[in-house]
Structure formats: structure tokens, C-alpha cells
């Protein structure tokens, strides 16, 4: 029999950090109630005989005392606690776990590397958008998981005994950021990956996602520096060079890198460079969730959507009372426009999908107030939890919604980093036109619109007599041509 409580908790006793995630089940989806994370650096407390030091164990117990208070009102059957790499190998893990279970009041399961990889993939499949066929990479403090899969099913599961804490202690223990340190760390990581590389490459993948603190740190760095969100080997090598220039770990300064993440960033970076090199990864983006989300979704009777983004968009529409028929009407129009100019404007499937998402959410600001509805919409999208969308994609959607009507904020379109600024500008133009043409909110009042693009010049051709028969929309289009002209986007209505 299911508990009446809608609260669930997942706790991950990792080698670098302990994490707790508490959620509430709401209408078939989850709402985050609390996230607590503490750096305990458990792996750093292992001696040559794999015994945890008293200090490391005490750091862990102090953290669990914090967690235990939050767990008191959650049924034990709705709590899952797992321990990973360090507690798999610690000779005195039993002593630590006995006290941990007393503090938490529930069992702590030490899971195998393969089970950890499976749970990570489960978390990614529930929270991350993109292609059905993926490679998932998670660099933890004491282990690194590599998983391929299709949809919700993993196809290969690997857990390697290398992590950002163990590599820190092994290859950066002198606190120097020299070429030799990085070379040794990378070569050791490549030697770990090489035996499984062929198996992973044989499965293949269409997208690669990273689900670790190292990848999160890279995303924060790239957003701070105005780079696009895709992680590439070239960007990783540039960041390595910047770290080497800093000379010492204590003097590591990279724009966007927080002090909290700095200590294990070089070791995590060296492992990631090795993974990119051995597996020939072209690019990677940040996953929406991993181990903790995998634990939670394992307890919740929720289906894995084939497209997590579709579920998210549907949930947001329902929550903010969006007219789904009008949203779909605008989406279909915008998609038609995008397909007509896709070759000239270099709009790929990814760009068109993000444009469609903006269309489906463009009216959420009306739930706050008609006045400044675009600003309200942008604010909501910026701060809502949108599973399936990366932080950079959320920023792009917010930017498009803020620019959906009226004055155009060009700097805002340049500040997002999900797409090239020129592509974002072109999506904005198409969204604005689709909203105008769909303003009657009826399918039988949509004209046959033909678009032609020549660089930034956009010509909109309408059936003969249409403008005369529709004076309001003719006026809106005339004003739109002026708005776009102010930012040097030539728009011709014919």
C-alpha cells in the first residue's frame, strides 16, 4: 500500500560530496523541495591500506546529521540512500556505515559500479532531452561511469576506478599545475578507458551528455565567458592551457570557476580530456539529472517519456493555463517559416526544435498579466525547473519570449549561448511573424505565407488582396517591419 505522503528523498554518499535531494510528487511530475550538498572529500581520507581516516569519517557523519533533520517527516520506504566508490573499497566501511544508518534512521546501500552506472542512466533518461541514442559520462570523486543507451534502456554499463579526488591525490598532490601533471593524469585515464573504448564505440551514440560536477563547472565557465554551451576537446585544451598558466592549484583562476569547484577541477578536466580523446567525442552537453534522480524515479511510478521536453512543455502549459491549440498554431506557422528559409539561414533541426518550444510557451506570461506579458513569460522560463532543457537553452527561450513583440533587445539575443547570436536573431524574427499571423486564433484564418531570405533580407509574400482584407494584421505587419528595421533587419511585406 502506497504512503499518503508525497515526499521522497534520495541521498548519494559520494567520494567527493554527499548530496540529498527531496522532492514532492505533483500530478505525475516531481517538484524539488530541497537540495543539500556538502563537500566531505571522503576519498581524500583513504590511506595506503584503504582505511578511512577518523577525520574523513567525522566529516561524513557531520553532514549526515544535517540530512537527518530533513528526513524526519518522510516515510522510510520513500527514502533511498546509496554509497558509491569510496565506501565500496574502504576496508573500514562497516564502521562508517553503522553510524551513518543510526544517524539517518534508514538503510545505506553500498551499490556496485555497474548499478551506479544504471541509476545514472535512469536519471538522465528521465531528465535530459535530445536524441534517443546517447552516451552518458559521469566523473565522480572516486569513479567514472560511462554508459550507452537507447531511450530508457542502457546498452553498456562501465564503472572505472578513477575520479576527480583520487586523480587529485595521485597526480596533483604537489599542488602544481604543470604540463607533466596533466600529461601523467591524462595518460593514466586513457589507459583505464582504452580496454572499453571499442565496446562503447560499437554501440554508438548521437548525443553525449555529462552528468558530473566537472561538466557543471565547465558549463558555468562557458556561460560566464559567453561561449556556446557545447563542450568540445578544443575548449577543454584551452582551459587546460589556462590552468597551466596559473602554475599552482591555489592560484587557479578561470572566469566562471567557483572556489568550491576549483580544487578538483584540474583532475576532473584531465579525465574528461582523456575520455574525449579515446572515444572521439565531438561535443558534450550537460545532463539534467543523474544518480539521485535515478534513485527517485525508481521509487516513483512515473513513465519514461520518449521526449522529456514534450512532457515538460505540456506540464508548463497546463500549470499556466496556456491555450494549447493557439500555442500549436503558432508553432506550426513558425516551423513552416523556418523550413522555407532553413537553407539560407542555416537553421538545423536543433534550432527549429527550440523555436517550437518557444512558440508553445509564448503565452505563459498572460497568466500573470497582459501588460508586460513577454517580460513575465521570460522571467517564468528563466526560473522554472524545465527538465530536458539545459541552462543555456532556458536562457535562449527566455530571450526569445522577451523579444516576441515590440522593441527588440539585440544585446539580449547576443548574451545567450545556446545558439550563435545570428541564429537566435533569425528565430526571433520568425517567432514574431508567426504570432502576428496567428493572432485571429483560428486555423481557417491563416493565410498561405511565402518567405524568402537573402542574408538578413526577409521578404514575406501574401496572397493578392490579403492585406486589404485584413487591415489590423496589415497594420501589425507594417509596424513589425519598422521594429525589425530599427535593428537593421530588412523586412519586406509584399
Curated annotation (Swiss-Prot):
GO terms for biological process: guanosine pentaphosphate catabolic process; guanosine tetraphosphate biosynthetic process; nucleobase-containing small molecule interconversion. The keyword Cytoplasm does not apply. It is an enzyme of class 3 (hydrolase). It catalyses: guanosine 3'-diphosphate 5'-triphosphate + H2O = guanosine 3',5'-bis(diphosphate) + phosphate + H(+). GO terms for molecular function: exopolyphosphatase activity; guanosine-5'-triphosphate,3'-diphosphate diphosphatase activity. InterPro entries: ATPase_NBD, Exopolyphosphatase, GppA/Ppx_hydrolase, Guo-5TP_3DP_PyrP, Ppx_GppA_C, Ppx_GppA_N, PyroPPase_GppA_Ppx. Keywords: Hydrolase. Its EC number is 3.6.1.40. Pathway: Purine metabolism; ppGpp biosynthesis; ppGpp from GTP: step 2/2. Gene3D superfamilies: 3.30.420.40, Exopolyphosphatase. Domain 2 (3.30.420.150), Hypothetical protein af1432 (1.10.3210.10). Belongs to the GppA/Ppx family. GppA subfamily. Catalyzes the conversion of pppGpp to ppGpp. Guanosine pentaphosphate (pppGpp) is a cytoplasmic signaling molecule which together with ppGpp controls the 'stringent response', an adaptive process that allows bacteria to respond to amino acid starvation, resulting in the coordinated regulation of numerous cellular activities. This is Guanosine-5'-triphosphate,3'-diphosphate pyrophosphatase. It comes from Erwinia tasmaniensis (strain DSM 17950 / CFBP 7177 / CIP 109463 / NCPPB 4357 / Et1/99).
